[in-house]
Design a protein with these regions (language model features):
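Intrinsically disordered, low-complexity segments used for protein-protein interactions
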Residues: 1-4, 118-122, 280
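Conserved aromatic/hydrophobic "specificity hotspots" at molecular recognition or selectivity sites
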Residues: 1-18, 64, 74
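Phenylalanine-glycine-rich, low-complexity intrinsically disordered regions
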Residues: 3-4, 19-42, 57-62
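12-transmembrane solute porter fold
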Residues: 13, 26-27, 38-48, 52, ...
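Pocket-edge structural micro-motifs
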Residues: 19, 55, 161, 287
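Interfacial non-cytosolic loop connecting adjacent transmembrane helices
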Residues: 237-241
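Intrinsic disorder in cytosolic terminal tails and internal cytosolic loops
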Residues: 269-289
Length: 289
């Protein structure tokens, strides 16, 4: 075990509040594409989630041993890497949601064909993961994040210009490169963020990072799908398929803007190696004793 093990008691109220808080927000945002922002289902879910999450945070701040330590956000590097991770997950899930709508609803391809279009990206990302890990050990996460967000921004361009007869090969290549960019960001950013925390906060940081990523994916998908739907409706073109494609193009323009924001924020990354963090904590512990 890399972290100190201790017996803890489950705080039932915290479990209930966190379930309603995170669950309500996730369900609310994920339902926007189906019901719309003004739906009672969405609004009630978001309100219940927000209120429950507020009381959950208050509860954690008053517990001696909180279930989820929000103090991890006091560390600037962790906060930044977590936010960037949310942006990446929003772009990833958003693309994986909108692209099949294009291939199946607009181009009339089967679910199998769509899966084959998406498959190379998943394979390349999995294959390159250990290689990216070795690169991270040598150069750190900042350079990888800058490169990854650059790829995400550039690969948004082909999706901004989708048409009724866009090249499927180009779409496949662009999506594959997009997932390579995601792979260059996700693991290095997560590692850099966790490395910035003292050892006793690592479990809380890991849990918080995973939770925020899911929130980012849910919120990002809701926003991108909402933009796609409203833009398609406002286009009011004679051909419904052209209106749908227009909405998708607009959604990917926003996606590209998000990637540029991530690229700019990546310049502010300042990594702290784990051995330095441990030395600082050990020295503070020895001085206090």
């Amino acid at each position: 075990n890399v972290t100190q093990q201790r017996d803890t008691r489950i705080d039932v109220l915290s479990v209930i509040l966190s379930s309603f808080g995170f669950g309500g927000l996730l369900y609310g945002f994920s339902s926007v594409g189906t019901y719309g922002w003004t739906s009672a289902t969405v609004l009630i879910s978001l309100i219940v989630g927000a209120v429950s999450l507020f009381f959950f945070i208050l509860r954690q701040s008053n517990l001696k041993r909180p279930m989820l330590e929000f103090g991890v956000f006091k560390f600037a590097i962790f906060s930044l890497t977590t936010f960037l991770g949310m942006l990446v997950f929003a772009l990833l899930i958003g693309t994986e949601t909108i692209l099949p709508l294009y291939t199946q609803n607009v181009r009339g391809l089967s679910a199998l064909d769509t899966g084959l279009i998406l498959l190379p990206g998943a394979l390349f990302m999995g294959f390159l993961s250990p290689i990216i890990g070795r690169i991270f050990d040598k150069v750190g996460g900042k350079g990888l994040a800058l490169g990854g967000f650059t790829i995400l921004a550039v690969t948004s361009l082909p999706f901004m210009m989708l048409s009724l007869d866009s090249s499927i090969t180009l779409i496949t290549v662009a999506y594959t490169l997009r997932l390579i960019g995601v792979g260059m960001i996700m693991m290095p950013l997560t590692t850099a963020g966790i490395n910035s925390l003292p050892p006793h906060l690592i479990p809380h940081g890991t849990a918080m990072n995973n939770t925020m990523r899911q929130m980012g994916g849910s919120i990002g998908t809701a926003v991108l799908v909402s933009i796609m739907s409203s833009s398609a409706a406002n286009a009011a073109l004679s051909d419904p398929m052209k209106s749908a494609v227009h909405g998708m193009n607009t959604s990917f323009i926003v996606s590209g803007a998000i990637a540029v924001i991530g690229l700019v924020l990546s310049f502010f990354l300042k990594e702290k190696r784990k051995n330095k963090v441990m030395k600082q904590e050990l020295s503070s512990s020895s001085s206090s004793s």
